[in-house]
């Protein structure tokens, strides 16, 4: 199968490393110098250092050529840019005829749209889906066992994703609920910032467990309000991705929270991180979308208040703990 991966960041490179030995894979990098260096050195030193690229993996900085590569023989295009680049890439690929998958997790800044909503607007006739789940790029690239979910309303496209991505180290499940899969992938980044803050403040494992559990309740409330299935949030893209991102130190969003708890400013944290932490950019959008739907998301609101400087981490914690006691469940709490 011909597969094009658009975006030579950590995730795009990691997925390419996994599929290139089995499929005709072309990895596109926006920067020509970066593409040439990666192809010559067989190492993406900036985003995935120390991982050798397979000889079969080719690189290009020519976007038109990258798209054309997947047009033949019913190929696939995987968009591995940050959420901010999804609209542009979908528009460029809309007429290709290839199946389109994206890896980014978040709500689009400005519009508040999820990936499938962006696709409906700019590529309404395309076959599209989202590939998500608990997955650190470095572990995927190393061939460590990972499970993902391929979500699309197109059954044939879901089956094609299994053929393309499933391997001895990467297990791919399918879902017909892209809304739920996208909400889980987007909001868990915000909850991971909250758990990072709590851990950075030394609040203990009880507090971490409470934030993860009540964070899952927030994710579920928002998702079902948007039309998702409840059981989706008990799966890989919900509970699975939340647990990994909230507790694993390879998580960029968790690292943001840990550093904020140490008193560093957000600009300092982001400069030191050097990579995109989607939760920082989508938190306010998540909250705005929830408020428009009348969905209560107190943990998300606390994270937004810390990110924009209205509350310190300690003040945000105090506000959460002083909330009126309620019954547990998915009703507003």
Curated annotation (Swiss-Prot):
Catalyzed chemical reaction(s): sn-glycerol 3-phosphate + NAD(+) = dihydroxyacetone phosphate + NADH + H(+); sn-glycerol 3-phosphate + NADP(+) = dihydroxyacetone phosphate + NADPH + H(+)
Give GO MF terms, alphabetically.
glycerol-3-phosphate dehydrogenase [NAD(P)+] activity; NAD binding
- Pathway participation: Membrane lipid metabolism; glycerophospholipid metabolism
Q: Which residues bind sn-glycerol 3-phosphate?
A: 105, 133, 135, 188, 241, 251-253
Keyword terms of this UniProt record:
Cytoplasm, Lipid biosynthesis, Lipid metabolism, NAD, NADP, Nucleotide-binding, Oxidoreductase, Phospholipid biosynthesis, Phospholipid metabolism
Enzyme Commission number(s): 1.1.1.94
Q: Which top EC class is named for this enzyme in its record?
A: oxidoreductase
Main location (coarse class): cytoplasm
The record, for InterPro entries, names: 6-PGluconate_DH-like_C_sf, 6PGD_dom2, G3P_DH_NAD-dep, G3P_DH_NAD-dep_C, G3P_DH_NAD-dep_N, NAD(P)-bd_dom_sf
Q: Which is one Pfam family of this protein?
A: NAD_Gly3P_dh_C
The yes or no answer to whether the keyword Coiled coil is present is no
- Please give the family membership noted in the entry: Belongs to the NAD-dependent glycerol-3-phosphate dehydrogenase family.
Q: Which NCBIfam families match?
A: PRK00094.1-2, PRK00094.1-4
Q: What is this protein called?
A: Glycerol-3-phosphate dehydrogenase [NAD(P)+]
Per the UniProt entry, what species is this protein from, by scientific name? Methylibium petroleiphilum (strain ATCC BAA-1232 / LMG 22953 / PM1)
């Amino acid at each position: 199968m011909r597969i094009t991966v658009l975006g030579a960041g950590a995730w795009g490179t990691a997925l390419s490393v996994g599929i290139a030995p089995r499929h005709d894979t072309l990895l596109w990098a926006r920067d020509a110098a970066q593409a040439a260096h990666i192809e010559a050195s067989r190492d993406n030193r900036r985003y995935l250092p120390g991982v050798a690229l397979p000889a079969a993996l080719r690189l290009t900085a020519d976007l038109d050529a990258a798209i054309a590569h997947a047009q033949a023989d019913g190929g696939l295009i995987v968009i591995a840019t940050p959420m901010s680049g999804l609209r542009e890439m979908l528009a460029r690929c809309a007429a290709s005829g290839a199946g389109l998958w994206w890896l980014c997790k978040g709500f689009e800044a400005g519009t508040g749209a999820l990936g499938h909503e962006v696709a409906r607007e700019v590529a309404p006739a395309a076959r599209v889906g989202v590939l998500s789940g608990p997955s650190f790029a470095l572990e995927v690239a190393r061939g460590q066992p990972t499970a993902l979910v391929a979500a699309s309303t197109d059954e044939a496209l879901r089956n094609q994703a299994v053929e393309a991505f499933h391997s001895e180290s990467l297990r791919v499940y399918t879902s017909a609920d892209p809304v739920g899969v996208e909400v889980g992938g987007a909001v868990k980044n915000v909850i991971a910032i909250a758990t990072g803050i709590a851990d950075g403040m030394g609040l203990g494992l009880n507090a971490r467990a409470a934030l993860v559990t009540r964070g899952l309740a927030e994710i579920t409330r928002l998702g079902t309000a948007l039309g998702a299935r409840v059981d989706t949030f008990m799966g890989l893209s919900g509970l699975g991705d939340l647990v990994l991102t909230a507790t694993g130190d390879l998580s960029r969003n968790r690292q943001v929270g840990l550093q904020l708890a140490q008193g560093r400013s957000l600009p300092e944290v982001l400069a030191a991180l050097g990579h995109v932490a989607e939760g920082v950019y989508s938190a306010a959008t998540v909250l705005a979308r929830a408020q428009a739907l009348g969905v209560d998301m107190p943990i998300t609101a606390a994270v937004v208040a810390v990110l924009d400087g209205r509350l310190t981490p300690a003040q945000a914690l105090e506000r959460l703990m002083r909330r009126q006691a309620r019954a547990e469940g998915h009703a507003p709490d």
